[in-house]
């Protein structure tokens, strides 16, 4: 049994305790979300990919939670490869950015899943 080292390895969101997703695994996740009918927007964050305290000593709701959206959400997207290609584009634009993938349910108007699709080196 292996224990995860507690120092220097921050955890982020869903799937963060797994090794980085391969392209095939990312395609499978995206396909699952598209089959569910969820909209796949992408977000990126250059400064910090985790919740941090910005305005006070205690964490507030807005501290480090809102990222910049990459282009527009992919409404009507049906091809997982197209979505993964967008992830590759985000990785090139700001190469030191975190890339977050979201599954948004437009019927219930809620975010159903969110996970880090790419972390820069050193995280």
UniProtKB/Swiss-Prot annotation:
One of its GO terms (biological process) is photorespiration. It is found in: Plastid, Chloroplast. The keyword Chloroplast applies. GO terms for molecular function: ribulose-bisphosphate carboxylase activity. InterPro entries: RuBisCO_ssu, RuBisCO_ssu_dom, RuBisCO_ssu_sf. The modification Methionine derivative is found at residue 1. Signal peptide: none annotated. Keywords: Calvin cycle, Carbon dioxide fixation, Chloroplast, Photorespiration, Photosynthesis, Plastid. It comes from the Eukaryota. It holds the Pfam family RuBisCO_small. CDD domains: RuBisCO_small. PANTHER family: RIBULOSE BISPHOSPHATE CARBOXYLASE SMALL CHAIN 1, CHLOROPLASTIC, RIBULOSE BISPHOSPHATE CARBOXYLASE SMALL SUBUNIT 1A, CHLOROPLASTIC-RELATED. HAMAP family: RuBisCO_S_bact (MF_00859). Belongs to the RuBisCO small chain family. RuBisCO catalyzes two reactions: the carboxylation of D-ribulose 1,5-bisphosphate, the primary event in carbon dioxide fixation, as well as the oxidative fragmentation of the pentose substrate. Both reactions occur simultaneously and in competition at the same active site. Although the small subunit is not catalytic it is essential for maximal activity. Heterohexadecamer of 8 large and 8 small subunits. This is Ribulose bisphosphate carboxylase small subunit, chloroplastic 1.
């Amino acid at each position: 049994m292996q224990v995860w080292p507690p120092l220097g390895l921050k955890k982020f969101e869903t799937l963060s305790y797994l090794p980085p997703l391969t392209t095939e695994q990312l395609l499978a996740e995206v396909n699952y979300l598209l089959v569910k009918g969820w909209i796949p927007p992408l977000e990126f964050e250059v400064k910090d990919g985790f919740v941090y305290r910005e305005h006070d000593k205690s964490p507030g709701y807005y501290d480090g939670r809102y990222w910049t959206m990459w282009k527009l959400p992919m409404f009507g997207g049906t091809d997982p490869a197209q979505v993964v290609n967008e992830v590759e584009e985000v990785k090139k634009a700001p190469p030191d950015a975190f890339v977050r993938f979201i599954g948004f349910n437009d019927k219930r108007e809620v975010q159903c899943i969110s996970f880090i699709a790419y972390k820069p080196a050193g995280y």
